[in-house]
């Protein structure tokens, strides 16, 4: 079976993911749909209808597979998106484009109908665009053969999958909902419930043409009933393009749409009318003639078909399964009918093993967030358009199975950087060679350049070769001849560096001649140069034919090395050539994918190379031998297998550990890494010989490449299970790997993540150690570097893939950890003395709770970890903790008191981390209220002070978050139920404890009051509960206890609570007044206002301003309440009723101390905070209305300056009038204040400037009247009001002291 490489995700539905893929070993790209098995009927239907269709306008089916968890459908890749996307982006298309697209639609649909296939659910989302713009039909999930029942087919496939048909009728019923397509494009007869037909498909075709031109379908509505009404009874409006610059529809196009959208199928266009329509301008002439030559048998016979066929016949009998009564039955491909339902089966893995390893994840990055497409039947499946998104689709959290995870991990063990190839010959890191030069003067043949050699004609090339061979084969032994021969060999070394020249020389008679001279050359100078030429040819050639005597050369070189093994210089000359020839043969054999006898390397060659590796050899010889093994073992070939001996691993390790040259150490460990890729036992032998600790210590090497290769070796070992149990239990190993995450090298960090993933898969306990060693921090750091949208640097793609797999695995761990903890706690629930086995289970499970804490504190893991299941499990654990706190369960004896308290503390801390992000709780509001808050309320009553405080804080903050969240549309009823449950919980369980809670030291009262604040804000009726629970006296006791710290959290909370109590319209204000509300408010207001007005102390200004705003609201509420009571009393008095005004007078007397705040309210009027300024003015206005100028300090010099400045700076006439009314009330009710006003020049000047603007009306009239009277009395002038304005205006009532009487 061929494998496929998966690239980026290009689509996603509720049960399907679409990838761009490639068939391994080719450059053929495809679309690969990975679908859950519950969609087998739809996918089977798609396959049976299209597996033999080859048409330019239909997406080609390639093959399908079944693995353990999924169905995989491989189809043609369309890169242009869907027609739906095109319409959405362009809004509407010109008529010429509609015609061009329409030709493709008609051609494809016509071909399907000729084959007897009805598409049934034609919509823009199921039409894909190939790159050049060709439209193709896709997603045949709901298509069918004319006349058959799709429900029966689906039920039959599902029954066969289930192993029988005992429930076939039930299956048929359940399938009815699965075969419904999009109603928007359905024909009227389909809406009425009749079967699909050719004419119903043509109606859908008309809808598509209409939508392409106008940008919207002919019939559309938000409600199904209204849409059905339109389809059945309304005529479509003429299509109008959204872009007004586009020309209107032509008469031919309107005529075509009218013919296709006829509600009566008998009047609707047939194929003949469609194909011959003038709108197409002869573009469908070929289709038209093809249809005419067939005499339209299918169209007639389908409409004459008496009824649906039995799908069992269609599946089981190719004869009976064909449409009854159809004369053109031979046109219905027999591939649509199956003699046996098991005939049409997806391919499975060889050997019957169902796994997903045939689909390999490519090295390209997969986007973390992909656009989702709804792939359910009827929604339109779009394998190549990531833009198509269904509003109903939901993200599915598909976790990889362990087999699939490890399959992807194995693909990541070796990267390109692990398998880099560098030359063996002329490698400067091994040995620096002098540059090769030749003298053209003594060459005795044309010194052709490489460029010239490439363009030589065959005859010239042959002549050139003949001259070269003749000169090399010359038997002359003079010094000049030898020098000329050496010069020629140098020339050949130079030209052999070009690939094409090297390939031609290698396959020429010259190569055989060079081999001969290796054997018979008169001196070693010639032999070394010949060997160098052969090595250069082997290095640069691009192919190797079987007739080239390369094995002969290898054998000869092996013999020469063996015969002269004591000569280090000769080995340095011959080993590079031997290595290049071995690598050449290995690469060619790997390319051909099978072993060839003509390339069988003699065993002596391997023996010689092994001897060159051993201790005692020269460093250069060791390096060359290691380099040969490194290069050859990069390939999967028989030549590489020749090195897989028991001693190769320890020999390379010894070379690595004892060499003093870094380049040699890197080559040795690289060779070991690559030979371990061939045979993992090579590294296993090393560990067994030198010990695991010695090998682990090598990870601390200062050489990055060494660290990289060591990590690769350990990953390979872990992947095949060798020494698995030892490695996953070795804490030093884990700690060393985690320290490598600080490396600046991206590949090292990626491989460290991969090693840790292998460890964590097999030993969950190491997750705790890893988290304590800051693994989560490292993951967050590298996740930011590899996040989508950032420019990807080299190696970041590989890092992202390793990181993604690690994150996927770690996300699955919290549910397992919580499940284990729940099982352990459930086993000891209610037991005072757990058994030894139960205690051991507790010791294993409870210490893992910090892992959950680490993950929920991480922005990478938190959104994936906090689910409804997580919160439910967490709430259940809290219930067990409640049982432990009440003494019903005892775990202290099993795990110790310290461990028990630590477990509870970490558990509470985990939820504290969750509530820092309120958005996570929005979707699970009911779960939190039902399962988490009740045990928290119980823990508030705990005897353990720390748990009690912690639980109260969590309860307070959680409740504040939950009650402040608005329920989503449709969730109002559930939200109401949750609120009722919360209210009952707090009323029955918590409020009775408040008398004790509020008297505890800080910060307990602050959290308790914060909860009351949240509840009274969210549900004002909760105020009644506060009063009924007799908490009001306790609230004022809290004020007395904490009044010295006015800015503390407790005072802030109590002031906010008082604000809510006063603001509630049905609040029992009398109760508040009886508890000393007025005095407390005066004291708190005075202290807070003083802090706000203190310009020298800016530290407390901001918190004091916030607190002052709340106190102003309280004061305003109190004054408003008093004003309402007084107004009611005056109305009773005015009406002549004998109503009692004593209550109002008592309230006025009780509230009179509030007049002392006037001198503080006036300086607050110019506040920069508009809220403080506005509320202060309202409070001041009501105070002077109630008490007039009772406060002699009201118009102190400082306050009058404030009034003067405000009158001159306020531009809004309403603000000026309010200030004037306040002044008028003060000066007309208190002569002392009037005298003070007369003696203050700045305020008088301000009033005089405002006089013309107000023309002596309203409040200005009252002030001027008072001033005039006082001046007249001083000068003996009769008391006549200026300009004839009455002194006090209309008759009104005035309050002085505590009596109510007329003015």
Swiss-Prot record:
Gene disruption: observed consequences: Knockout mice are smaller than sex-matched littermates, and all exhibit domed heads typical of hydrocephalus. The majority die before reaching 4 months of age. Brain lateral and third ventricles are severaly dilated with frequent hemorrhage, sometimes accompanied by fibrosis and neovascularization of the meninges and choroid. Nasal passages and maxillary sinuses are partially filled with varying combinations of proteinaceous fluid or suppurative exudates. Suppurative otitis media is frequently observed.
Summary of the function given for this chain in its UniProt record: May be involved in the remodeling of cytoskeletal components, such as alpha-tubulin, and in this way regulates neurite branching and elongation, as well as cell motility.
Entry EC no(s): 2.7.11.1
Source superkingdom: Eukaryota
Gene name as annotated: Ulk4
Single GO term (MF): protein serine/threonine kinase activity
Keywords: ATP-binding, Kinase, Nucleotide-binding, Repeat, Serine/threonine-protein kinase, Transferase
Protein name per its UniProtKB record: Serine/threonine-protein kinase ULK4
Catalytic residue positions: 121
Entries under Gene3D superfamilies matching the protein: Leucine-rich Repeat Variant, Transferase(Phosphotransferase) domain 1
Compositionally biased residues, Polar residues: 384-400
UniProt cross-references to InterPro entries, sorted A to Z: ARM-like, ARM-type_fold, HEAT_ULK4_RUNKEL, Kinase-like_dom_sf, Prot_kinase_dom, ULK4
Repeat among keywords: yes
Positions of HEAT repeats: 504-543, 727-765, 796-834, 926-964, 1025-1063, 1105-1143, 1151-1189
EC top class, as a word: transferase
Catalytic activity: L-seryl-[protein] + ATP = O-phospho-L-seryl-[protein] + ADP + H(+); L-threonyl-[protein] + ATP = O-phospho-L-threonyl-[protein] + ADP + H(+)
Organism from which the protein derives: Mus musculus (Mouse)
Region (Disordered): 304-332, 369-401
Family label: Belongs to the protein kinase superfamily. Ser/Thr protein kinase family. APG1/unc-51/ULK1 subfamily.
Gene Ontology biological process terms from the UniProt entry: adult behavior; adult walking behavior; axoneme assembly; brain development; central nervous system myelination; cerebral cortex development; cerebrospinal fluid circulation; ciliary basal body organization
């Amino acid at each position: 079976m061929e494998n496929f490489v998966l690239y980026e995700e290009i689509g996603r539905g509720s049960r399907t993911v679409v990838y761009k893929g490639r068939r391994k070993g080719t450059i053929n790209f495809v679309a690969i749909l990975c679908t859950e098995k519950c969609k087998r009927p739809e996918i089977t239907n798609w396959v049976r209808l299209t597996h033999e269709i080859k048409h330019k306008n239909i997406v080609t089916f390639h093959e399908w597979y079944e693995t353990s968890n999924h169905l995989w459908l491989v189809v043609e890749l369309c890169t242009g998106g869907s027609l739906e996307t095109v319409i959405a982006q362009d809004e509407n298309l010109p008529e010429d484009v509609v015609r061009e697209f329409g030709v493709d639609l008609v051609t494809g649909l016509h071909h399907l109908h000729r084959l007897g296939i009805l598409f049934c659910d034609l919509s823009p989302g199921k039409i894909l665009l190939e790159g050049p713009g060709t439209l193709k039909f896709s997603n045949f999930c709901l298509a069918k053969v004319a006349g058959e029942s799709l429900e029966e087919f689906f039920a039959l496939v599902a029954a066969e999958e289930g192993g029988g048909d005992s429930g076939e009728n039930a299956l048929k019923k359940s399938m009815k909902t699965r075969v419904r397509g999009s109603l928007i494009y359905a024909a009227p007869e389909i809406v009425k419930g009749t079967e699909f037909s050719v004419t119903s498909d043509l109606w859908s075709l008309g809808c598509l043409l209409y939508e392409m031109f106008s940008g919207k379908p002919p019939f559309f509505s938000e409600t199904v009933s209204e849409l059905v009404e339109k389809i059945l009874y309304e005529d479509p409006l003429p299509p109008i393009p959204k872009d007004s610059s586009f020309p209107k529809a032509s008469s031919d196009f309107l005529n075509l749409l009218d013919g296709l959208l006829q509600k009566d199928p008998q009047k609707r266009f047939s194929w003949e009318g469609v194909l011959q329509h003038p709108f197409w301008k002869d573009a469908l002439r070929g289709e038209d003639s093809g249809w005419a030559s067939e005499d339209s048998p299918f169209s007639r016979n389908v409409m004459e078909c008496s009824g649906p066929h039995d799908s069992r016949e269609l599946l089981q009998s190719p004869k009976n399964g064909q449409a009854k009564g159809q004369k053109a039955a031979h046109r219905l491909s027999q591939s649509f009918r199956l003699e046996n339902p098991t005939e049409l089966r997806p391919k499975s893995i060889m050997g019957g093993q169902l796994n997903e390893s045939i689909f390999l994840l490519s090295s390209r990055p997969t986007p973390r967030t992909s656009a989702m497409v709804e792939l359910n039947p009827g929604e339109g499946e779009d394998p190549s358009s990531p833009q198509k998104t269904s509003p109903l689709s939901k993200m599915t959290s598909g976790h990889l199975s362990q087999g699939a995870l490890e399959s992807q991990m194995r693909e990541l063990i070796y990267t390109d950087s692990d398998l880099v190839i560098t030359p063996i010959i002329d490698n400067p890191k091994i040995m620096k060679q002098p540059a090769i030069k030749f003298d053209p003067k003594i060459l005795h043949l044309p010194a052709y350049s490489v460029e010239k050699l490439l363009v030589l004609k065959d005859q010239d090339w042959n002549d050139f070769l003949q001259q070269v061979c003749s000169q090399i084969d010359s038997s002359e032994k003079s010094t000049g001849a030898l020098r000329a021969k050496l010069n020629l060999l140098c020339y050949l070394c130079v030209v052999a560096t070009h690939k094409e020249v090297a390939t031609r020389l290698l396959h020429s008679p010259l190569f055989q001649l060079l081999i001969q001279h290796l054997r018979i050359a008169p001196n070693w100078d010639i032999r070394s140069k010949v060997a160098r030429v052969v090595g250069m040819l082997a290095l640069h050639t691009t192919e190797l034919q079987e007739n080239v005597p390369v094995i002969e050369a290898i054998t000869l070189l092996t013999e020469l090395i063996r015969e002269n093994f004591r000569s280090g210089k000769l080995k340095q000359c011959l080993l590079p050539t031997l290595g290049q020839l071995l690598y050449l043969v290995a690469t060619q054999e790997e390319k051909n994918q099978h072993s060839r006898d003509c390339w069988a390397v003699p065993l002596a060659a391997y023996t010689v190379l092994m001897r060159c590796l051993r201790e005692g050899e020269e460093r250069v010889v060791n390096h060359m031998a290691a380099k040969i093994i490194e290069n050859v073992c990069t390939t999967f070939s028989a030549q590489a297998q020749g090195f897989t001996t028991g001693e190769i691993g320890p020999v390379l390790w010894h070379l690595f550990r004892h060499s003093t040259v870094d380049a040699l150490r890197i080559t040795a460990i690289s060779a070991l890494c690559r030979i371990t890729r061939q045979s993992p036992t090579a590294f296993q032998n090393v560990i067994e010989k030198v010990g695991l600790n010695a090998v682990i210590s090598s990870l601390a090497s200062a050489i990055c490449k060494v660290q990289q290769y060591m990590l690769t070796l350990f990953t390979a070992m872990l992947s095949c299970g060798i020494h698995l149990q030892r490695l996953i239990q070795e804490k030093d190993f884990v700690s060393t790997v985690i320290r490598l995450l600080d490396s600046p090298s991206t590949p090292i960090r990626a491989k460290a993540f991969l090693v840790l993933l292998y460890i964590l898969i097999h030993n969950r306990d190491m997750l705790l150690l890893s988290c304590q060693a800051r693994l989560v921090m490292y993951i967050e750091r590298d996740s930011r570097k590899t996040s989508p949208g950032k420019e990807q640097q080299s190696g970041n793609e590989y890092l992202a893939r390793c990181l993604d797999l690690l994150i996927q695995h770690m996300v699955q761990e919290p549910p397992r950890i919580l499940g284990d903890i729940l099982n352990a706690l459930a086993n000891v629930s209610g037991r005072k003395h757990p058994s030894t086995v139960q205690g051991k289970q507790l010791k294993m499970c409870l210490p893992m709770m910090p892992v959950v804490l680490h993950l929920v504190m991480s922005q990478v893991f938190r959104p994936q970890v906090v689910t409804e299941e997580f919160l439910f499990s967490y709430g259940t654990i809290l219930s067990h903790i409640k049982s432990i706190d009440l003494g019903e369960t005892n775990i202290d004896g099993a795990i110790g008191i310290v461990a028990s308290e630590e477990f509870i503390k970490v558990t509470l801390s985990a939820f504290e981390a969750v509530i820092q992000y309120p958005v996570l709780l929005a979707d699970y509001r009911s779960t939190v209220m039902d399962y988490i808050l009740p045990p928290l309320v119980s823990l508030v009553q705990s005897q353990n002070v720390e748990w009690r405080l912690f639980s109260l804080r969590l309860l307070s903050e959680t409740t504040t978050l939950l009650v402040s969240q608005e329920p989503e549309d449709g969730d109002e009823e559930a939200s109401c139920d949750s609120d009722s449950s919360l209210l009952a919980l707090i009323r029955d369980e918590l409020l009775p404890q408040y008398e004790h809670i509020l008297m505890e030291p800080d910060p307990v009262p602050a959290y308790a009051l914060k909860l009351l604040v949240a509840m009274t804000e969210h549900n004002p009726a909760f105020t009644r509960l506060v009063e009924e629970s007799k908490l009001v006296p306790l609230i004022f006791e809290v004020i007395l206890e904490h009044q010295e710290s006015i800015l503390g959290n407790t005072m802030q909370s109590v002031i906010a609570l008082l604000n809510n109590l006063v603001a509630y319209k049905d609040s029992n204000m009398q109760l508040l007044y009886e508890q000393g509300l007025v005095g407390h408010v005066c004291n708190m207001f005075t202290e807070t206002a003083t802090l706000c007005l203190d310009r020298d102390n800016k530290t407390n200004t901001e918190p004091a301003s916030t607190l002052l705003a709340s106190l102003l609201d309280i004061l305003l509420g109190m004054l408003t309440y008093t004003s309402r009571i007084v107004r009611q009393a005056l109305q009773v008095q005015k009406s002549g009723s004998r109503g009692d005004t004593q209550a109002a007078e008592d309230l006025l007397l009780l509230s009179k101390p509030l007049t002392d705040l006037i001198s503080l309210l006036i300086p607050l009027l110019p506040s920069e905070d508009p809220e403080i300024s506005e509320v202060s003015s309202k409070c001041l206005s009501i105070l002077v209305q109630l008490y007039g100028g009772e406060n002699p300090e009201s118009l102190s010099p400082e306050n009058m300056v404030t009034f003067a400045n405000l009158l001159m700076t306020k531009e809004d006439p309403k603000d000026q009038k309010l200030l004037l009314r306040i002044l008028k009330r003060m000066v007309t009710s208190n002569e002392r204040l009037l005298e003070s006003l007369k003696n203050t020049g700045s305020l008088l000047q301000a009033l005089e400037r405002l006089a013309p603007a107000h023309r002596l009306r309203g409040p200005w009239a009252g002030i001027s009247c008072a001033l005039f009277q006082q001046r007249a009395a001083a000068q003996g002038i009769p008391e006549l009001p200026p300009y004839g304005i009455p002194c006090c205006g209309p008759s009104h009532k005035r309050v002085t002291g505590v009596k109510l009487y007329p003015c």
